[in-house]
């Protein structure tokens, strides 16, 4: 944990901040990075110690900030939390874009995703599973909204649209436990690329396969992932 310098928070929903305070209380060198509006949302919505603020390091959308040797730019995403953001992370020549908990692909999301060699993007639900599943109608409507979550098929079309040889790793994240499975998400997202003739690696060893055009992985919902070694495609 000594090498970890900060925790970047996308928004104030409980599944994104639940363990942040317990981590920084134990490892006091770690800062909590979020927008001031997101911090206010966290303090308002959750039963959390006021000392949470002691670890706060503010940032603002579209204004780059630094954590150690990483340059980070937060950008707007469409979700129903408070001041929701994704992150564009730069380290040397490496570019990593993260967008999770978003109901649609906005121009700002697209702007940063197209610059990255590595992307982490939500692939939350399979539409048929959601519509025939046990969720109440109001919850289905929330998920389907433009400030809800991304359907596997939407993510698949978007990745197929933006793919270029420089894109080496795609991480699918925030998969629903009730309305999705890793196999369904991967099958849906990889199919358009297969149809275009691209070779897809699964990143199973945590390293880039030089036989594949791109590595696509579905990240686990509840467990830690393996450690991935990110290397840009030399194409």
State each model region's role.
Residues 1-38:
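Active-site metal-binding motif and surrounding structural segment of the metallo-beta-lactamase
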Residues 4, 53, 116-117:
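Short, well-ordered alpha-helix to beta-strand connector turns
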Residues 4-12, 33-35, 97-101, 120-122, ...:
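Active-site neighborhood of phospho(di)ester-bond hydrolases with catalytic His/Asp-centered motifs
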Residues 13-17, 40-41, 81-82, 105-107, ...:
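Active-site environment of divalent metal-dependent phosphoester hydrolases
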Residues 18-28, 44-46, 180-187:
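Metal-dependent catalytic neighborhoods of phosphoester/phosphodiester hydrolases
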Residues 56-60, 218:
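Short acidic-hydrophobic, aromatic-tinged amphipathic segments that line or gate anion-handling sites
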Residues 60-118, 223, 227-235:
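Core dinuclear metal-dependent hydrolase active-site scaffold
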Residues 107-218:
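Cap/insert and terminal regions of metallo-dependent hydrolase folds
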């Amino acid at each position: 944990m000594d090498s970890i310098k900060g925790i970047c928070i996308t928004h104030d929903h409980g599944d994104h901040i639940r363990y942040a305070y317990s981590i920084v209380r134990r490892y006091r060198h770690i800062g909590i990075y979020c927008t001031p509006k997101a911090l206010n949302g966290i303090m308002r919505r959750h039963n959390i110690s006021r000392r949470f603020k002691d670890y706060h390091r503010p940032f603002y959308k579209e204004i780059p900030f630094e954590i150690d040797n990483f340059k980070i730019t937060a950008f707007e995403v469409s979700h129903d939390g408070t001041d929701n953001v994704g992150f564009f992370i730069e380290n040397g020549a490496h570019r990593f874009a993260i967008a999770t908990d978003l109901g649609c692909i906005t121009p700002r999301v697209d702007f940063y995703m197209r610059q990255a060699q590595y992307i982490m993007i939500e692939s939350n639900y399979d539409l048929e599973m959601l519509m025939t599943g046990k969720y109440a109608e109001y919850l289905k409507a929330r998920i389907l909204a433009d400030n809800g979550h991304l359907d596997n098929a939407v993510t698949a079309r978007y990745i197929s649209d933006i793919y270029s040889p420089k894109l080496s790793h795609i991480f699918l994240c925030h998969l629903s436990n009730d309305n999705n499975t890793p196999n369904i998400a991967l099958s849906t997202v990889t199919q358009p690329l297969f149809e275009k003739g691209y070779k897809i690696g699964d990143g199973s060893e945590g390293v880039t396969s030089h036989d594949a055009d791109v590595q696509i992985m579905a990240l686990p919902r509840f467990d830690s992932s393996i450690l991935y070694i990110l290397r840009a495609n030399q194409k």
